Amino acid sequence: MNDVLTTRVAALQVDTCIGDTQYNLARCKALVEDACQAGAQWIALPEFFNTGVSWQPSLVNAIEDENGPSAQLLQSLSSQHKVVLGGSFLCRLADGSVRNRYQCYNRGELVGHHDKDLPTMWESAFYEGGDAGDTGELGVIDGVRVGTAVCWEFLRTATSRRLRGKVDVIIGGSHWWSIPENWPVLYSWLEPANRENSLKTVQDTARLVGAPIIHASHCNDFSCPMPGLPLTYRGHLEGQAAVIDGQGKLIAHRTYEQGPGVVLAEICMQEIEPAAPVPDRFWLRRRGLIPAFSWHLHGVLGRRWYKQNVKGRQPSVATVEAPAQ
């Protein structure tokens, strides 16, 4: 019988305090170290691992450059523990624009980066989408072709088209909001489908690309104003940190209710024949009534606010330091 070569990987689930970079980096560092102690060689942190995102204008002051404290944490932990480590953060470029940038390091060396293609809902207030030529391919590690995707990129068919046939593994993560809990009846009606989407879209992408996915996430409760509406959002981030194989099968998983922690699994870092063609449509799944409404309303309001308050602004002097190694 032939032995199948596998790699131990970890997807991290973080209880994030939105906007508190110092706290979040310390929590991420602790989880990375837990994963390393458990033998993980590849470790995924989620989208916005350093700050989280909500409609909180002060987040502008937490935007870093590509060599800021959050990138330094990724690099130093990857180097110290000799692992592959990735995550995304709000990153200001030299031209003054801001991107949601995913960086991946191998043993302390930058493998590559990817800027999320389109901001989701009120994220539009803090960054703009990546360049059209950015496929999400990060590079090659020991012969393994590595790609990434974050959050609603898993919901768009374009992501599967970009990565199909080009990667052996996808390392990424999400920052996926629940339906507002303000109205219990509406929440109980709409939230099950939203929560299902937050995991099934990742499984669908794995199946359509034919590559395993290491998917990190957040699981915190939070509230914030709703842009353009006289309401306060009260809800949570969905959790769903997971390791998924190239057939879309769930190997290991952590729910919102299970809180922060490490999802560990052994996977084969190798592309397989995709299970189905990529659907000929924009969205992989129906978004649901409230997410679709928010996509349009908060996208318009957010883009306007970004142009007026974020784009072109000079980076503030960093007052946050990466946790001591």
Q: What do the predicted segments below correspond to?
A:
Residues G87-F89, N100-C104, E137, A241-V243, ...:
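Short beta-strand scaffold segments in enzyme catalytic cores
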Residues A211-P212, S217-Q325:
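C-terminal beta-strand edge segments of enzyme domains
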Residues E66-G86, L155-G261:
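CN hydrolase (nitrilase-like) catalytic-core segments centered on the catalytic cysteine
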Residues V4-A11:
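Extreme N-terminal starter segment of soluble prokaryotic enzymes
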Residues E66, R92-K200, E257, P274, ...:
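Active-site catalytic loop in hydrolytic enzyme cores
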Residues T21, L25, K29-V111, W176-A211:
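Cys-nucleophile CN-hydrolase/nitrilase-fold catalytic domain and related Cys-dependent amidase chemistry
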Residues Q13-I18:
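Short polar catalytic/cofactor-binding loops
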Residues L12, H114, G139, A216, ...:
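Hydrophobic residues at beta-strand termini and immediately following loops
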